[in-house]
Amino acid sequence: VTKQSFFEGIKMAKAGNHLFDISNAIDAYIRPYGYGIVRDLVGHGIGTHLHEEPEIPNFAQRRRGLRLQPGMTLAIEPMVNLGTADVRWMKDGWTVISADHSLSAHYENTILITEGEPEILTLRA
């Protein structure tokens, strides 16, 4: 479900669409399964730093967000819990678990917005 939601999201990752079109597509795919869609961790822009603006939620948004333009590089990373959407950080400050200790899944790739279809930069052939 998590992997497929990524591919549903990037169908909307086209120049001229809006950032939250991606979020809404991811949410629309996951929600019927009844899983918790993690809200505390989101996708993000990629540039001179690993984590940059804009933030890309994996859950539905009422706003549209900024307009996607060719050359934008984005990390799209749906995160789904079998139980609650809530998460908590472990003492190491890096490890994140679901608050109810249910199983979780995360799928991530970096994409490039182009004039046509988005290019997946991190997917191996």
Regions found by a protein language model. Name each.
Residues 1-125:
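Active-site neighborhoods and metal-handling regions in enzymes and metal-associated proteins
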